[in-house]
């Protein structure tokens, strides 16, 4: 059996394809979705989206929060923004992580601290997406 996966942002369609499985970051933790999953509507947290294609190859994307609806083997993810793991430059992601860590250490005031923590979280998620090693079949 297959799942129809749609990942949409206000700017573009990130994904529109049949897949075997996904692993999604939600506000209550990560969930795995296989065919015939129980219907669910859930908030999507910032984090990785793991996609298992029909040929058993795994891909990764990064979601920057949103909403997901899973029903009748169809997954619709409406995201605020998203990136495919293959679009992330590892060197750029590492540099962004280093900058975020430096900015956090010199943050002053509540606003600066919150912004620095958010930037650090985003940078770590991007690094995780780039460095993720898929499970062996």
From Swiss-Prot:
Compartmental location: Plastid, Chloroplast thylakoid membrane
One record GO biological process: proton motive force-driven ATP synthesis
InterPro entries attached to this UniProt entry: ATP_F1_dsu/esu_C_sf, ATP_synth_F1_dsu/esu, ATP_synth_F1_dsu/esu_N, ATP_synth_F1_esu_C, ATPsynth_dsu/esu_N
GO MF, one example: ATP binding
Keywords tagged on the record: ATP synthesis, CF(1), Chloroplast, Hydrogen ion transport, Ion transport, Membrane, Plastid, Thylakoid, Transport
Pfam families (UniProt xref): ATP-synt_DE, ATP-synt_DE_N
Keyword Transit peptide: no
Membrane topology: Peripheral membrane protein
GO CC terms, sorted: chloroplast thylakoid membrane; proton-transporting ATP synthase complex
Subunit structure: F-type ATPases have 2 components, CF(1) - the catalytic core - and CF(0) - the membrane proton channel. CF(1) has five subunits: alpha(3), beta(3), gamma(1), delta(1), epsilon(1). CF(0) has three main subunits: a, b and c.
Function (record text): Produces ATP from ADP in the presence of a proton gradient across the membrane.
Similarity-based family: Belongs to the ATPase epsilon chain family.
Family annotation (PANTHER family): ATP SYNTHASE DELTA/EPSILON CHAIN, ATP SYNTHASE EPSILON CHAIN, CHLOROPLASTIC
Annotated protein name in UniProt: ATP synthase epsilon chain, chloroplastic
């Amino acid at each position: 059996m297959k799942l129809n996966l749609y990942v949409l942002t206000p700017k573009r369609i990130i994904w529109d394809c049949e897949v075997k499985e996904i692993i999604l970051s939600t506000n209550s933790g990560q969930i795995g979705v296989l065919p015939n999953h129980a219907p669910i509507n859930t908030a999507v947290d910032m984090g990785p989206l793991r996609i298992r294609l029909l040929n058993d190859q795994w891909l990764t994307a990064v979601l920057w929060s949103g909403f997901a609806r899973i029903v009748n083997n169809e997954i619709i993810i409406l995201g605020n923004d998203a990136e495919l793991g293959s679009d992330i430059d590892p060197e750029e992601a590492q540099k962004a992580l280093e900058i975020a860590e430096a900015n956090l250490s010199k943050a002053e005031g509540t606003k600066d601290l919150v912004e620095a923590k958010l930037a650090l979280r985003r940078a770590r998620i991007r690094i995780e997406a780039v460095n993720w090693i898929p499970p062996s079949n």
